[in-house]
Amino acid sequence: MKKSIFSKKLLVSFGSLVALAAIPLIAISCGQTDNNSSQSQQPGSGTTNTSGGTNSSGSTNGTAGTNSSGSTNGSGNGSNSETNTGNKTTSESNSGSSTGSQAGTTTNTGSGSNSESGMNSEKTENTQQSEAPGTNTGNKTTSESNSESGMNSEKTENTQQSEAPGTKTENTQHTS
């Protein structure tokens, strides 16, 4: 009689364990879903290049310009590339060119800043502007700041401007 009661209890306990173990397996198999998601990344994300706008990557190069005249013909292109190797070496190059012909009143305003931490840093800016004959009154204000911690620092700025005959009044301010 005791064996019979013990056997029934053992059988009931074993059956309960099997049932409890099967519930998660059933839930897993019923609730299993496959999530396949695809994302497309727009070209140029990570580094943003906009003419007359902002190039931003690990370090920040910012330029802002405003040109207003009676008639304006302009084209510009720019490229920005940066390579980081390890934690101590940073190599950055920024090149851009713009060509425009303008007649009338022109106002150019630009500001840029470059801040880096690395072994070598270099900043180069080239500006070219040609203007058609006429009366030109231009105000150009440029402010730049360059702060770096590293071993070598080089900054080069080239500005070229050619104009056809005419009357021109220009004020240029440069602060570093």
Curated annotation (Swiss-Prot):
InterPro entries from the entry?
Answer: VlpA-F-like_signal, VlpA_N
Membrane topology note:
Lipid-anchor
**Lipid link (N-palmitoyl cysteine) located at?**
C30
Q: Which UniProt keywords apply?
A: Cell membrane, Lipoprotein, Membrane, Palmitate, Repeat, Signal
Would you tell me the protein name for this molecule? Variant surface antigen A
Bias class Low complexity marks the residues at: 35-121, 143-153
Q: Does the keyword Signal apply?
A: yes
Q: Which residues form the signal peptide?
A: 1-29
The annotated region (Disordered) lies at 33-176
Tell me which domain of life the UniProt entry assigns to the organism this sequence originates from. Bacteria
Q: Which organism is it from?
A: Mesomycoplasma hyorhinis
By which gene is this protein encoded? vlpA
The extra comment attached to this record reads:
The numbers of repeats can vary and is one of the basis of the antigenic diversity.
